[in-house]
């Protein structure tokens, strides 16, 4: 979900909502209602996927007012694994901002991440996503001035920050929106 938002997606879908009974069937005549497809298992109980979707939806709801009014200008790819997967092995196109800079953003440091770069009502919004699917990431965004004002939205919560550098700690696959004021 977060990578889709970084690339500028305006909608997401979860499929299927309810797990069809035939997807729960395992060899030997048993059923797995917990770890298969669907936010709700064929037995009617919530699966682990429900809780991932719930967490993602809280973040989507919090960033919606910004991203829906923004235009994606591209992404910055930072780190060896992300660069290898997206630029070296992938089919990178004009969406890649190869300079690593975008408007006031001068430098990205730390662990592997993708930074979605947005024009938000003529200003700057950045959606930073941890590229690692297994470990937390520490990422810093450095700007050209020490007294910028930002709104940072992470885990569905918003806070205002002032400074020239923003350190972010992101869970695996997690995203945070940084909006310059």
Named regions from a protein language model:
Residues 12-16, 127-129, 151-153, 178-179:
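Conserved active-site loop/cleft motifs that coordinate metal ions or position small ligands
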């Amino acid at each position: 979900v977060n990578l889709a938002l970084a690339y500028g997606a305006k909608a997401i879908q979860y499929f299927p909502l309810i797990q069809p009974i035939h997807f729960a069937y395992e060899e030997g005549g048993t059923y797995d209602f917990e770890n298969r497809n669907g936010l709700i298992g064929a037995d009617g109980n919530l699966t682990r996927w429900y809780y991932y979707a719930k967490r993602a939806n809280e973040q989507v709801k919090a960033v919606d007012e910004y991203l829906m009014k923004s235009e994606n200008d591209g992404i910055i790819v930072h780190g060896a694994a992300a660069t290898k997967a997206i630029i070296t092995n992938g089919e990178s196109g004009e969406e890649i901002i190869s300079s690593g800079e975008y408007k006031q953003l001068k430098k990205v440091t730390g662990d592997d991440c993708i930074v979605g770069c947005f024009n938000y009502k003529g200003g700057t919004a950045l959606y930073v996503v941890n590229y690692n699917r297994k470990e937390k990431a520490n990422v810093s965004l450095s700007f050209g001035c020490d007294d910028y004002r930002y709104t940072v939205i992470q885990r569905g919560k918003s806070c205002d920050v002032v400074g020239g550098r923003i350190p972010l700690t992101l869970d695996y696959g997690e995203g945070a929106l940084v909006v310059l004021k």
